Amino acid sequence: MSDNNPEIESSTFNNLNIDVTESILYHLPIPSLVRFTLVSKQWRSLITSLPPSPSPSPSSPPWLFLFGIHNTSSFHNQSFAFDPLSNTWLRLPPSSSSSDHLVGSNRFLFTTAPRFSFSPILKPNWRFTSPVRFPRINPLLTVFTTLSNSSKLILVGGSSRIGGLVDIEERLAVQIYDPVLDSWELCSPLPADFRSGQDHQTLTSALFKRRFYVFDNYSCFISSFCLDSYTWSDVQTLKPPGLSFAYLNSCNGMLVLGGMCGFSFNLWSIEEGSMEFSEIAVMPEDLLFGLVDSDDEDDKFRSLKCAGSGNLVYVFNDDCHKKFPACVCEIGGGENGICSWRRVPCLPSPVNKFHKVVSFCSTVSITDVFHPEEARIGGSIRG
């Protein structure tokens, strides 16, 4: 935008066809839209009156969210979001929830214990659900769209606590939440091949083609839950040679595994039927060693995390001593698509020390910023 008289520019926008105006604004980075609302009352009215986008814009890649939790003083909690279009970190309001059992997915934060609740990411407004049949901490969680185009939430795995201890014998049932009926449905737990009591510290998941895939880092077992029949597939093994740990993602129409293989961080595309894998990218060495301390022990890479969606895969270190350095890989389209890596800027100072970091990536819509009260579980989510 130019530095001309804002009233003239507003008048110019008003003379445009409404569809053209909306198309232009939908393609702007959200931080730019927020700044433009300060130009004049006309601009603010124009931008805040935009209808919700029916689906994520191709020019709106997923943001990376980091929620730092301090276990003795919520005053030290901090929240950040990285917008790849503007290449900037934004400070967010810290979570107002009293629970530190947070999970993030699909533009929402969720508390899973002692009561289940959810809130839009950008402007906290917590809402409780009906009681969960089997409360749990650290479950796998995502929102999916049903064949009737409604949205539901699925909980898989996690740990239950009895007297502060984990019940290692219990295999928690899958639970599916219907936000319209405010009700939970019980389904079969993870296949018996997966150890009981596992959570997102050992399991990783991805929503892909109407199936919820779960991968176990210890056994390298993988299985998928059909979101139509509510049944589990046969358990298969997924282990590229030399793999030490990995994270499952759904990116660019592919099932993507990202993890450490020896002393390199690789990305593989996964064929969902056979679980055959093919390498699509390797992180440049200078970026990889910029994420860890060179004088660490052999497990120095263990604090690396990976989260991907759309055409981006984020890799970051959730060790507070490193202040959460990160990089991002853009996955090219097509069979011969070129993947490009770049470093993510440092978090804005000051950055506190946290006992727990909740991290995930998600698209962000105009509704999330200007009309969070209208945000709904599953809005603009495509399974």
From Swiss-Prot:
Keyword field contains Transcription regulation: no
The Kelch repeat ranges on this chain: 63-109, 158-205, 253-308
Signal peptide: none
Keyword check for Kinase: no
Domain of life: Eukaryota
Entry-linked PROSITE patterns: FBOX
F-box domain: residues covered: 10-66
SUPFAM superfamilies: F-box domain, Kelch motif
Key words of the record: Kelch repeat, Repeat
InterPro entries for the chain: F-box-like_dom_sf, F-box_dom, Kelch-typ_b-propeller
Gene Ontology cellular component terms for the protein in this record: cytoplasm
PANTHER family found in the cross-reference section: F-BOX DOMAIN-CONTAINING PROTEIN, OS09G0555300 PROTEIN
The protein's name in its UniProt record: F-box/kelch-repeat protein At3g24760
Species in which this protein is naturally found: Arabidopsis thaliana (Mouse-ear cress)
